[in-house]
């Protein structure tokens, strides 16, 4: 971390985790950008960052074309990360494993799964629609008695080292000239319809030509400092680990009809989780130690029974460690808010990823850089994710939310 000695930058990015670091990297990689980039990060250990605490996976199985396209680029980026983010010949490794996602559906959900798969295939994603006998043939350990269908990502989906991705983006951005400053924004200064500076809690003032909000769980508060309201709330999510002695061969990231999920994490080891019902979904506050508490009854009473029903081998498991982390939920439609912030012409939003941030970071960082440097999206049109839909109360509905 450096100090902002000259107190000015062409672009100030608030939030130095995976999204902010991706934006910094893509900005400084653009031949059309010649400016200075300062990334303000309040906790350079990233101890409570969603990037570090995520289940770190990527899928193409969305119900909206823009999300599918974002992830199609994302998997291309992750496959070639060693070339893209190498620094002085040191190629980062993120242990990408393309084991696929397996969505399970009952009779009630089968038609939606079929519609989604048709769109995914039309966009070029390698997703198969499987009937119960086909599911059983591919995954003999799976209980299909109450299933009507499933969709499985034959390629292009899987999991990886999220911490490794964050560090690779950060290291590459710094090698290109990004300056990381430890600090927390206390104030955003505006003159008319433009942001002119941010002031940190230690009193440091950093003038800026452009301000980018990649502040994660602090994104709503930062937006409000700039006079912008976004429907984003940080929610608490738990990740539980367990081990299973009985082999569950070629296990993908399994999503049960109940919403519980599990994926392999090494030989005989798994991680799992689920989203609570809305009326019992706890908020997350970075400064509140209670936000880091773990509700083990949620695992014992809901997640474990759901997974054991779907995979009988999971009836006899050994629970392991667990952790909680922030999940920055877009309350409008569970989709990210990306782009220029309404009337504040030089303030850009990158918030509310609702659990999709790691996998979407390559495409979103690239898109933000294009918008800042060129004024338009040049490669992948992300305008459907823009702030305009918030102002118009026009949700971009996504049916595949975990």
What are these regions (language model features)?
Residues 244-346:
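Active-site lid/adjacent beta-loop-alpha segment flanking the redox-cofactor pocket in flavoenzymes
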Residues 56-138, 259-261:
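Dinucleotide-binding Rossmann-like beta1-alpha1 core, especially the glycine-rich loop
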Residues 162, 305-402:
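C-terminal catalytic lobe of FAD-dependent flavoproteins
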Residues 28-50:
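Glycine-rich FAD pyrophosphate-binding loop
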Residues 152-210, 218:
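Helical element adjacent to the flavin cofactor pocket in flavoenzyme catalytic cores
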Residues 202-251:
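Central helical "cap/lid" subdomain
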Residues 4-19, 38:
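Beta1/beta-strand and adjacent pyrophosphate-binding region of the FAD-binding site
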Residues 65, 69-72, 103-112, 152-171, ...:
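Short beta-strand to alpha-helix junction loop
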């Amino acid at each position: 971390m450096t100090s902002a000695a000259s107190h000015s930058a062409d672009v100030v990015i608030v939030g130095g985790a995976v999204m902010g670091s991706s934006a910094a990297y893509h900005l400084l990689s653009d031949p059309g950008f010649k400016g200075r980039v300062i990334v303000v990060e309040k906790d350079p250990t990233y101890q409570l960052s969603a990037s570090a605490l995520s289940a770190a996976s990527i899928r193409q199985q969305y119900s909206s074309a823009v999300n599918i396209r974002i992830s199609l680029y994302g998997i291309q980026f992750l496959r070639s990360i060693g070339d893209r983010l190498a620094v002085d010949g040191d190629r980062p490794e993120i242990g990408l494993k393309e084991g696929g996602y397996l969505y399970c559906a009952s009779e009630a959900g089968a038609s939606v799964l079929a519609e989604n798969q048709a769109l995914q295939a039309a966009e070029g994603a390698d997703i198969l629609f499987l009937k119960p006998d086909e599911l059983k043939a591919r995954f003999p350990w799976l209980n299909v008695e109450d299933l009507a269908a499933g969709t499985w990502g034959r390629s292009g989906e899987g999991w990886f080292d999220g911490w490794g991705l964050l560090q690779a983006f950060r290291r590459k951005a710094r090698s290109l000239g990004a300056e990381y400053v430890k600090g927390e924004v206390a104030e955003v200064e505006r003159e008319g319809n433009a942001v002119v500076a941010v002031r940190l809690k230690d009193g440091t003032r950093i003038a800026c030509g452009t301000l980018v909000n990649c502040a994660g769980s602090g994104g709503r508060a930062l937006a409000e400092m700039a006079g912008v309201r976004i429907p984003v709330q940080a929610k608490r999510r738990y990740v539980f680990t367990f081990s299973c002695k009985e082999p569950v061969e070629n296990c993908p990231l399994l999503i049960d009809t109940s919403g519980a999920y599990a994926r392999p994490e090494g030989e005989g080891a798994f991680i799992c989780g689920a989203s609570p019902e809305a009326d019992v979904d706890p908020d997350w506050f970075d400064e509140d130690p209670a936000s880091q508490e773990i509700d083990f009854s949620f695992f014992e009473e809901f997640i474990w029974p759901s997974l054991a029903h779907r995979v009988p081998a999971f009836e006899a498991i050994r629970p392991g460690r667990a952790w909680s982390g922030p999940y920055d939920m877009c309350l409008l439609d569970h989709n990210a808010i990306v782009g220029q912030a309404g009337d504040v012409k030089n303030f850009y939003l990158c918030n509310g990823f609702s659990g999709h941030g790691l996998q979407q970071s390559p495409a979103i960082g690239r898109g933000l850089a294009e918008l800042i440097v060129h004024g338009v999206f040049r490669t992948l049109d992300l305008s459907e994710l823009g702030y305009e839909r918030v102002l118009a109360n026009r949700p971009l509905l996504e049916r595949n939310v975990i």
